[in-house]
Amino acid sequence: MKNAISLFSKHKNLLYNNGMITFDSLTLKAFVEENQEFLQDARIQKIQQPTRRDFIFQIRKNGDTRKLYININPQFHHVCFMSKQSENRRRIEIPQKPPMFCMLLRKYLENSRICKINQPQYERILEIFVETYNEIGEKIYLCLAIELMGKHSNVILYNDDTNVILGCAHNVGAEKSQVREMAGTLPYTYPPKQNKTDILTYNGIIDYANLSKDFYWFSKSFSELVMGEPLEKLKEYVALTNLSPVISNNYKKYCLFSSLLTDSIPQKTVNEMIDDYYSYYQEKDKFVNLQTHLLTLTHQKKKRTANSIAKMQSQIDRESNCDKYRLYGDLIMANLYNNSDYTDKITLFDYENNQNITVELDATKTLKENANKFYKQYNKGKTSRQKLGEMVEELLQTKSYLEQIEYSLNKAKTYEDLLEIKPELVEEQNPKPSKRNTNAPEKIEKGEFTIYIGKNNRQNDYIVSKLAKDDDLWFHTKDCAGSHVLLKGDKPENSLILECAQLAKEYSSASKSSKVGVIYTKRKYLKKPPKANLGYVTYSHEQEIILD
């Protein structure tokens, strides 16, 4: 568990504390100006709410249909029109039963006409004003306020005439905020004003160290980029003069002006910049969350397996004493006629250990009956010990299997890699047919030879059962988790065999260790036991290479 938690924390720190910037008011201003024309008089056709924190509005105008994506997650809060590619990156899944707030939005906003969009001055709020009709056919005007303010992000629907809230994505009670409550039937109010200055009307001296504190529009990340720029240039930026949106090559930053961000990737539009940047981090977040979840499950299963092995091993140790009962039975049977029946104990000479032993007896039974009782105890213990030994062997195979899963999870690079491993850990009820093909093993061409490397148990199983022919060579690290490596081709040189052994070590949990044993043998000497786990094989006729 600790390993899984530390992995989760490590990746979260990389995502949120090592460069990703938050959506700011100037970016929202640029988005509004860019999309004002399309949204004006457009119609909201369909509303979906994949999770508590994101929404999809299908909007249509003049034959052009776009998906407005709203995210109010504290880490990823933003708004943009999604491309098909970014929708796939976000791994959006629509629930069969929509949430109550989604039902409310559908009731009031589907088929409504957008009258205008607005950004209240300096705020990270996008207002979408709509014209629609109530139950009795009267025209009404509503406003959807999309507040993109970190942990306070929210979506609020209110009546534009009365200012009364109809519903919120998240209700905010007095216990959470004494300044601004949010719930149905309450009046909608803007956040408290910040004591800042509009730089467009300012003509004094700039304190660059406090730029984000003193002026509207300047977030901390944007302030870092414009450090030292003259006042007139700062005004041009806020006026959105000469927009040229870019994302840095390492995806740590985005900027509305390419001149401020070197080593960057040009974006066609502000929307494309927002969409690409945040979907990149959402994809990474989905990957980390699933990887952490699966690693946690693996560690839990490993712990339960280890506990079961220890418990059964203890039982085997106790049952190992059953041999004494056979000895008691043998000694009693050898001395039946030298001793009396119905006694509570008997002293006999043990010829194996050359000593006298005293055996406690059941005084209500004859000596022969006592001997048979000891034989039964011996046979019971022997059978139990044998069954426990078989169970321990199965559990050791399970332990090895889980170690292989753990290795594959840590080596996974894509979300698809994790999805391929997930069924080995999670039994889904009524699983949906997969739309994606199983990932292919890694393939390396070497002249007339081909090398295959499995990235998980499923691929390892596929390599052995489907790809390999009898005389192909199979490689695997000895006594540790790793990929199955297959060398296809006739009579490979020793140098190629050594290269495959190196690959088997590289793709294993012992990749950074020294003196690692790699075994290899022909496919025809591999055997998959009945009911064995995916990727598990036994082997014979193997040879071993020791690698530093």
Locate each region found by the language model.
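Extended, highly charged segments
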Residues: 4-548
